[in-house]
Curated annotation (Swiss-Prot):
Name of this protein: Elongation factor 2
Source taxonomy: Archaea, Methanobacteriati, Methanobacteriota, Archaeoglobi, Archaeoglobales
Superkingdom: Archaea
PANTHER family on file: ELONGATION FACTOR-LIKE GTPASE 1, TRANSLATION ELONGATION FACTOR-RELATED
Keywords: Cytoplasm, Elongation factor, GTP-binding, Nucleotide-binding, Protein biosynthesis
Protein family per UniProt: Belongs to the TRAFAC class translation factor GTPase superfamily. Classic translation factor GTPase family. EF-G/EF-2 subfamily.
Residues annotated as domain tr-type G: 18-258
Classification via PROSITE patterns: G_TR_1, G_TR_2
UniProt binding sites for GTP: 27-34, 93-97, 147-150
Predominant place of localization: cytoplasm
Positions carrying Diphthamide: 594
Amino acid sequence: MARAKKVDKIKELMWKPKFIRNIGIVAHIDHGKTTLSDNLLAGAGMISEELAGQQLYLDFDEQEQERGITINAANVSMVHEYEGQDYLINLIDTPGHVDFGGDVTRAMRAVDGVIVVVDAVEGVMPQTETVLRQALKENVKPVLFVNKVDRLIKELELTPQQMQERLIKVITEVNKLIKAMRPDKYSEWKIDVANGSAAFGSALYNWAVSVPSQKKTGIGFKEVYEHIKEGKVKELAKKSPLYQVVLDMVIRHLPSPIEAQKERIAVIWKGDINSEVGKAMVNCDPKGPVALMITKIVVEPQAGEIAVGRLYSGTIRPGMELYIVDRKAKNRIQTVGLYMGPRRVEVDEIPAGNIVAVIGLKDAVAGSTCTTVENLTPFESIKHYSEPVVTMAIEAKNPRDLPKLIEVLRKLAKEDPTLHITLNEETGEHLISGMGELHLEVKVEKIRRDYKLDVITSPPIVVFRETVTGTSPVVEGKSPNKHNRFYIVVEPLPEKVIQMFKEGVVDMKMDKKERRRLLQEAGLTSEEAAGAEEYYEGNLFCDVTKGIQYLNETMELILEGFREAMRAGPIAREPCMGIKVKLVDCKLHEDAVHRGPAQVIPAVRSAIFAAILQAKPALLEPYQKIFITVPQDMMGAVTREIQGRRGQILEMKTEGDMVTIIAKAPVKEMFGFAGAIRGATSGKAIWSTEHAGFELVPQNLFQEFVMEVRKRKGLKLEMPKPEDFVGL
């Protein structure tokens, strides 16, 4: 099919949502996601077959090709014929590296089904679990592709019987995860060899088999085994091609937008399902109001900013005006397009159910809701499962480039919401914070290469969190004019409360009674639960006062004081986390003039600071879980390397002559680990990390770490005292 014909076919199919599949591919790093995507494209005639596998069509960012890992989720559309009917498959490739978890979460919002790729030799790995968990949470249905099956025969020399046992083990592990995460969906979503929701093969050598494909082609395990033993892989790829087997599985088992939106809208949108727009989204109605969720901003050198997202209802055309709900802005669409490989094809209009690329939505960011309905409830904000934990300072080598650097940093933050940018106007120093060392390296490289900017960066540093481990006495904060007084108590916030907010079980928009009940269950007293006013970055503010005059009209200023205190705590001006701040009493001046922002905010902030310093203050540091697979004789070298970094070994699993070590260590000690482990194992270690939350810094290191941070920030090199903030 020539290119023009393909475009016509895609244009025709985009109007038939019954024949559309919006899917993602997720996996652990290096399990073969991008190679699989390429071969699916080759099969659908989008790239030449000889090149697939080497070409890494989706890794079209130069850096991705050099590093050999997928950094951004790329979009492609292709046409596949199944049982005499053409289908339009929109495919999003997602990164498997933990440092890029944000992209995966966003891609899950745009798709209805995923192909989970698992390496037959390594089995289900930690990152497989993480990405599958994200998919299940967003109500996205999985199918399974077990990759690199040829290695079982060539490298591990397994018999056909052992091979099947190995593959059944992988399926059982994936099913265990589905059952644990979605017991309600398990019966219809479980992976089953017999019905063809699992396929096996080699993405690199372009072949695959499944039970339904065996019925069509006569190629089953026995034939696969013989072909590989005899080195006839090319023949195998001709008789049972990968794309045919996998795309058939996608069409048979993954839902169309029509089926999926009936179930998914309620999970990702909290508005009224019976409203006009609610019904239009549930029915994927092209005639309804426009409801578009942006999942990614792509910056193309010629076209500029392109907003890519999923259209849930309505039809979009150039010239239309859309509200960007979260930005309270209105933008006019310039062009609308679909993807074919990395190429954007502009069309006249696109209806609901498709993945779209729009130019002109200049205020949109990843996660925005764009619509023709004023005051539409936005889609639930996309939850990222890891928060930025590593920071580096960055400056332009040539001071003349400073304005350009600021503009580039803003652009990067818009493309990738997991990247946090802090511009310090006083020192002229800019900080970028990300999910790990690699995440930041990639961004800095992008600045140098794509924007031709010479920049200098500091070595990476870890972001600590300040917290408390005890309860403070009541602390009085006075406003500068002495007319207002605030009485504050600070204590630890129960872990269960933090978890509930993080998972979205509780939020400040929900019904008050329901929230009160849930917070009490999680360990708050009934006064605290009823008085919960604001949850901010892992901290809770509770108003437990009774009948205080003027408090309502002053509350927003009090909360601003709370937020300021939580953004940068008293110990080392690091963000706070896990703190419950209670307002137990206050005295306010009757005249609003005497209780303005300049009076209330500093009074509340300094009272909170003094209270924190009297509540057994502590630092939390981010930890990483480390998974390393090495030959057994190198186990000693690896455990020494981990233990030398304040790490602890959690468990060890042996399989054949390889051993997998699972450990955890503070991120602070993990810089340079990649090089060290490569050296210690002469490059034979396969390793990956994932975030393991925050833990208390050991008491014997507390002082040293605080001074380190204070020195770096140019603060006084002494431990702060409560009297620095309030007159005791």
